[in-house]
Amino acid sequence: MARLRFEHTLAQGVRAQLACFDEMFPPERAAVHRMLARYGRETMWNLLQTKLADNAAKAPDGLEQAQKPWREALLLYNELLAENACCSLAELRIGGGELLAIGFSGRAVGRAKQRLLDEVASERLANEHGALVRRAERLYRSGWRGETDGRE
């Protein structure tokens, strides 16, 4: 793909879809929400349509059964979009300035926002300002900074 000439955004979209194509997830609300947050609305839509088409090609005799989980995931996808579910860092109802005020600094601000998004997408935390602030404060007090290699 590197030698073919594509627009940068098209190439990125194809790479993202290929990266998640083999990823299996149950047709459950939290799983679909996590995938939406990880890959974005457009890539998730394309993934679900591709999965439906792939199943149609692989299992023409048992098409209904093969497509059932992807149809359920598509219904959940549409439900989440209709509810304007939080699926990106920009949609979180807490800003970097508030995380700085709590005490996070530097890269830990971005890591904290990502952690909060993961919890919202897993449906363990509501995307409400007060709930996000309280969770961020608990994370900060616990010493969590999102470091994986000891460097900030």
Q: Residue ranges of each PLM-predicted region?
A:
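Divalent metal-dependent catalytic cores for phosphoryl transfer on phosphate-bearing substrates
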Residues: 1-66, 71
